[in-house]
Amino acid sequence: MEMKSNYVDIFKREIFPAKVRVEKGKIASIERIDTPCDTYILPGFVDAHIHIESSMLPPSEFARLAVCHGTVATVSDPHEIANVLGIPGVGYMLDNSEMTPFKFYFGASPCVPATTFETSGATLGPDEIESLLKMPQIKYLSEVMNFPGVINGDPDMLAKIAKAKALHKRIDGHAPGLRGDELTKYIEAGIETDHEAFTYEEGLEKLQKGMKILIREGSAAKNFEALAPLIPAYPNKLMFCSDDRHPNDLAREHIDGHVRRAIAKGYDLFDVLRIASVNPVEHYGLEVGLLRVGDPADFIVVEDLKDFKVLQTVIDGEIVARGKKPLIDSVTVETPNHFHTGIKKEEDFILERCVHTEIIHALDHSLITEEEIMDLSSGKAKDVLKITVVNRYEDVKPAVAYVHGFGLKKGAIASSVAHDSHNIIAVGCSDALIAKAVNTIIGNRGGICAVTEEEIEVLSLPIAGLMSDKDGFEVANRYADLDRMVREYFTSLLSAPFMTLSFMALLVIPELKLSDKGLFDGRSFHFIDSCRR
């Protein structure tokens, strides 16, 4: 393969017309030429932290969408499927990822389950983590979500970190809002990165104390605006990530979106491209080429350096996307799963209304919630709905609480994507509709759905209740239709209602969340009653 294009050299910070020659999947030569060129060739983009499962696609199908946006590799935490299926679930992701030329690099997830206050489908202890870390496909210890455990010297958590250190593996962090002396303790334990900084000040402190910061822009958590001002001072210490990206958003853009926004804000081109490609490759030691002689031929050709419209994506010398069309074939996939709950009844979702009721306040574009106290005894409170988490691994009574912020005026929605243990989560306008939505998910053995008295609309997710076995672009369109239905027909106030719903059970991010065991205060790490006595 040989192509002529304007060569973007991130290391020497220069751009010049060049002839790039590829042989046997490697960059054989880069030769300056005098001929003017209309396009630009640069290293492919890398998502430095993503849960592939959140795209609702297995790796082989995720790759088909991602390459259209110039992504050639991901640093992937298989935390979601590990919570459902354990080590066999991680093995599923590894095996499936090998069916595509895309470069997936997986980690060992140390917080399965994320806390002891919820029911998951599996548990990964220090021995299981060690066995994963010894696998050549496992590059790092994934996000250490239990930061209170690290700070307070939890033996299990520290043992997992010690396993990673002994095997010279990188260690990822997850510490929303952690500052001061507690942050120092967390870093001293060996934690190297964080993708959970929500403010400039938080990101700056973490950088100054030695961490690397991942600027996240996902389907729910959006921190780009807050953290982008860090770029000029810390271009070598930053990476871009999406963390959780739903299929409709992945079909629209990926890391190319981060790059476009950063350039539009006037940040230095070479700094931005370093963050999008070089930094994750160097930090994690990825076998991803950076467009140097001898490197694997992983690169993209773009129309210009403003909009970054991807014309070609190349991995190991193979053209894997041209324009917005993938050149990677879909593959047939298996559908392992884990569902052991029974059909639920309307009366399973009865909950007392009281004068001082604890309410979860869901916030748009945020994983954090707020605690509210409302008088529900009169039944006049506006936009207060029931929310439930149903244990899908055992047939037990659901947990029920109240939530504010969804804005539904009709219907109910439910999902088996409920971070991080992935029980069934639902919110709705009546107990009957909530039961209908929950039972729809149970009947499909996983998925997302929107129901009314007359209608049932569902996207089935038969792979662990997390991923579809259908074409990725079809899944993206179906998800977009359901999302639009909830926003427009159900009048949800949220820009991504299913994504926000999926994080209402994530106990490690405050303030109030709901697990299958009850209402949980993520600040004190204790269960609380819905009714304040």
Curated annotation (Swiss-Prot):
Q: Which domain of life is it from?
A: Bacteria
- Cofactor(s) essential for the protein: Mn(2+)
Catalyses: adenine + H2O + H(+) = hypoxanthine + NH4(+)
Gene Ontology annotations of biological process type: adenine catabolic process
- Keywords, sorted A to Z: Hydrolase, Manganese
EC number(s): the record gives 3.5.4.2
| Stretches of the chain forming a coiled coil according to its record | none
Single GO MF annotation = adenine deaminase activity
Concerning its family, UniProt says:
Belongs to the metallo-dependent hydrolases superfamily. Adenine deaminase family.
- The name under which this protein is listed is Adenine deaminase
